[in-house]
Amino acid sequence: MSTNTTHTSCPKESREDRAFQKTYAEGTLWPVKVGMQTLNLSGTYSCNGVPFSSLPLYDTSGPHSDPSLQVNPAEGLAPVRDSWNFIKSISVPCAAPVNTESMTERHPRMAEDGIALTQMHFARKGVITPEMEYVAIRENQQLEEWIRANGRGGTPSEPITAEFVMSEVAAGRAIIPANINHPELEPMIIGRNFRVKINANIGNSALSSSIAEEVEKAVWACRWGADTVMDLSTGANIHKTREWILRNSPVPIGTVPIYQALEKVNGVAENLTWELYRDTLLEQAEQGVDYFTIHAGILEKHLPLADKRRTGIVSRGGSIMAKWCRANKQENFLYTHFEEICAILKCYDIAVSLGDALRPGSISDANDEAQFGELKVLGELTTLAWKHEVQVMIEGPGHVPLNMIEENMQKQLEYCHEAPFYTLGPLVTDIAAGYDHVNSAIGGTLIASYGCSMLCYVTPKEHLGLPDRNDVREGVVVHKIAAHAADLAKGSPIARLRDELMSSARFAFNWEDQFNLSLDPPKTREVHAASMKAAGHEGEKADFCTMCGPDFCSMKKSKEASAASAIEPGR
């Protein structure tokens, strides 16, 4: 697939270094423009005989990092998908919107006569949508020639094509969460044959945070590399908070609809009804939510198994449905009405993230009968959703020790027919409070190397409190490290290239390129500057750092030894 590229400069608020430039790659099938950050290196480095003086980087920040665009949060982002003229051609305006409270004058749309408007539907028909072409360009990062020459594990391979994207979506091995009512979205793909993605959770609680703070956290998460964001608000103004987040988000937004439904019954789980939940789905569908976490797999028969656990049910949605089932002495209405749920989702192209209500909340509960019993039900629901051509991913644990992680991936592939796996960690120990983001990244790296498609981030506040923007940044960056490490383990030539360039810059003592090739350039620059200042070398472009100093730097001595060897007589 050939692409054309246009360039703009990158604003200071997006990257603190002007080496970064916002660039766009244009499609050939549809009028799509795929945004990237191109890093202009201060030096030229040779990797496998190919010179690199710049590197295109996958970018999730959207218009927020384009200096030619002025973003007003009160107005939201431009509806870029509308310009592709695809959504309007396949949908009709909603006749009677459930909720008319909106930031924009755009009228919500839906399928006509209940037909499927999903990416899976079009993929099965052999239609390449704008979203499919977009993600193919995005995954390649304009490095097609590098991929051909340096494919997985050093074996030459072909770049990702729109046709390959289509085949993976058709088979259910990948999803493109893209509600037709989220026109501000820049499409992305979740599947084990693509880059490992990460999700950032935000959302207010009954005790803290405002709409402005949550919008800021959503944009902040995108700026640092979150591929999707989940709004898990449980406090006041849930609808308005979600509206502002959606209108300002270039990444897919997920929710857990049962939270808002619970708010409508004043927090009394026993009073929930299918009709109330259905109306909540419609409300969020019309707003543009791209995927719903739905805890339809926890059944009455699982509850006695959960009672035997050390930490019971730790999923909020799972505990709500368990309480409802016991109080009403009925089966989970999300399970009994699942086909009706699918009938709604397919009209808006909303993906379903089948929630793991029985994920283990402690090491002692990992891989137990309750967890895997629910996983089998999620596999049944996957088949049912695919019958309606609804895109599906499966949520996973949780707290799992390292030696038990691989079994989770194996059973998910077996029970859930290779649908994408999306895990919370797993956290590999129970004693890492205050450092659970690191705990989660350890397990996340391993399970992603086995084939998990997306990692849900954990912040330093996990188990302790509501994260602020600094926690969001740290959680995102740490899980970007995990995702990148897994991509390396899986043989990604694009992931490998960035590491090769970093190593070259490090050996050349090119500090600016080292900062910019890292996942957090401002922090690396700040740490280095502070340490050099403390050692009395402020502002120097030194061929050493304060870890070893000028006399004990191994790389410096290695270069000196090589230089001396090269000029020895007789050589």
Curated annotation (Swiss-Prot):
GO terms for biological process: thiamine biosynthetic process; thiamine diphosphate biosynthetic process. GO terms for cellular component: cytosol. It holds the Pfam family ThiC-associated. Transmembrane segments: none annotated. This is Phosphomethylpyrimidine synthase. The gene is thiC. PANTHER family: PHOSPHOMETHYLPYRIMIDINE SYNTHASE, CHLOROPLASTIC, THIAMINE BIOSYNTHESIS PROTEIN THIC. Its EC number is 4.1.99.17. It comes from Chlorobium phaeovibrioides (strain DSM 265 / 1930) (Prosthecochloris vibrioformis (strain DSM 265)). One of its GO terms (molecular function) is zinc ion binding. Pathway: Cofactor biosynthesis; thiamine diphosphate biosynthesis.
